[in-house]
UniProtKB/Swiss-Prot annotation:
HAMAP family linked: Ntdp
Residue numbers annotated as active site: 26 (proton donor)
Residues where Mg(2+) 2 binds: 108, 110, 123, 126
Sequence similarity: Belongs to the Ntdp family.
Domain of life: Bacteria
E.C. designation(s): 3.6.1.15, 3.6.1.6
Cofactor(s), names only, from the UniProt record: Mg(2+)
Residues annotated to bind Mg(2+) 1: 90, 106, 110
Identification of the protein by name: Nucleoside triphosphate/diphosphate phosphatase
Residue runs in coiled coils: none
Segments crossing the lipid bilayer: none
Amino acid sequence: MVKESIPKEGQTIKIQSYKHDGNIHRVWSETTILKGTEHVVIGGNDHTLVTESDSRTWITREPAIVYFHSEFWFNVICMFREDGVYYYCNLSSPFVCDDEALKYIDYDLDIKVYPNGKYHLLDEDEYEQHMRQMNYSSDIDVILRRNVDILQQWIEQKKGPFAPDFIKVWRERYKKIRNY
């Protein structure tokens, strides 16, 4: 049994993404916690080492704020680039935290949001393939489709991590904690 823990502000944690079959998908080596509660974790990272399931590694190119919620089946990465804020949204299980890392199951579907507010649903073919290969239940499919709709509403309504104030507040908090 995994003992859950809530990460504390200023703490540095790993983020571990898994696939439905239990295999590790991707690991971010360092994310600084900006807010940690039972329901929401907000973190920041910059030039962070990422390790893929096949052991390949790469380093993130820009500062990012990450948003996880315990009641929604998605997480959001807000990436700060020269031409504006891009969002990469992963359809995923709600997060859990233990002493090792923040963890979630990646369910393939992604939404990319551009600085102008336009967005695209990505990886539908990968989702269909993995749904068959890993036997996603019909319940999970319904939950994920519902959360795609919720996520699209949040994007269109500029709610949660898509709100301009969210970006301003949490980017400043990250800079302060990291002494930028």
